[in-house]
Amino acid sequence: MTQIPTPRTFQEAYFGEAPWDIGRIQNAFAAVADQVKSPVLDAGCGTGDMALYFAAKGLQVVGIDYLEEPIRRARAKAAERNLNVDFRVGDATKLADLTERFNTVLDSGLFHVFTDDDRRKYVAGLAQALNRGGRVFLMCFSNEEPGQFGPRRITRDELKNSFALGWQIESIEPNRFETNPKFTGATFSEGGPKTWFVTVQRQAT
């Protein structure tokens, strides 16, 4: 049922078929690839497919995830493909601690896992990690997705409120998550869970 997931929830998911681990970049992010500017931070990178996609295009990419197992898998993929991505175990609520600054942050399914307090920390960290004029592209579960399984559903107003100060919201558009076809733990909407795909820019002044 809908809840704030714990680290153990994600650890257990990687023992089986994690619904979000589709083995490639989500199509919604591939569609905006020409807008993604280096250097890039993939926040909540999982097993690394999106970070590796952009590294293959020649971009400088850092990927962080809270758990060691997906980072281990991501590093193995990078080695197999001879791609250079800086994969790290890290806490996305502490992005201000990073020494680098980025022109793009990518978030595929991270925003919706936070408590209200951690979400505020995350957004504040995004502002610190991004260069002025940099963009965040994020996709999260929408309140239009029925049922109780999975992460919190996020409303359009919650997104607007989260990025009200110091940000320019460029778009909030309905979209869909693609899911791992081997995952059988729940049923989502036909065509994939309903989402919001969001583009926000850190204000230059």
PLM-predicted stretches and their roles:
Residues 1-41, 47-100, 114-129, 134-205:
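Class I (Rossmann-like) S-adenosyl-L-methionine-dependent methyltransferase catalytic domain
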Residues 103:
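Conserved acidic residues
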Residues 106:
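A conserved beta-strand element that flanks and buttresses the S-adenosyl-L-methionine
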Residues 109-113:
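Short catalytic micro-motifs in class I SAM-dependent methyltransferases
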